[in-house]
Regions:
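Solvent-exposed, conformationally flexible loop/turn segments
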Residues: 14-20, 61-65
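Short acidic, flexible loop segments centered on an aromatic residue
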Residues: 30-48
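Asparagine-centered strand-capping/turn motif at beta-strand->loop junctions
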Residues: 21, 25-33
Length: 134
């Protein structure tokens, strides 16, 4: 059984510096079992963060919401768009490790604030590519 979630930016980004933002994310666990969020990262070159570990992990009961904050680097000009950005979550679900990949489109408003739209969410078991390696 794989996790089912919805992830979206939870309100406006808050500036720490002109290119540094604290962004909140709402994670809705749509599954029938609890979801445990271990880590999150933003890997895109124009909308990025280091991996953030959650210690203790964030536990989200079935059919409930959780919230995380990630410090992101984004110095794009007002009016710019960043395509194919991602939020990647490392989670445990039903005693198995998973990656949740939320593909984002980032729009930079007229004040330089990034705002995301979630375009697609996929899940993959951790180690899935090793099964196909020779």
């Amino acid at each position: 059984m794989e996790p089912k979630v919805h992830i979206e930016q939870d309100g406006p980004a808050h500036a720490q510096r002109p290119d540094r933002w604290v962004i909140s994310w709402n994670i809705q666990n749509l599954g029938a079992a609890p979801l445990q969020v271990l880590a999150a990262r933003l890997p895109h070159g124009k909308f990025r963060s280091e991996e953030k570990l959650f210690e203790p992990p964030l536990d989200i009961p079935a059919n409930e919401n959780g919230r995380i904050e990630i410090k992101a680097c984004c110095g794009e000009a007002p009016g710019a768009e960043v395509e194919n950005a991602f939020v990647i979550l490392r989670v445990n679900y039903v005693a198995a490790p998973w990656l949740i990949l939320a593909r984002l489109r980032i729009r930079i408003d007229d004040r330089g604030k990034p705002a995301s739209t979630t375009e697609l969410i996929t899940v993959q078991p951790v180690g899935f590519s090793e099964r196909w390696a020779g």
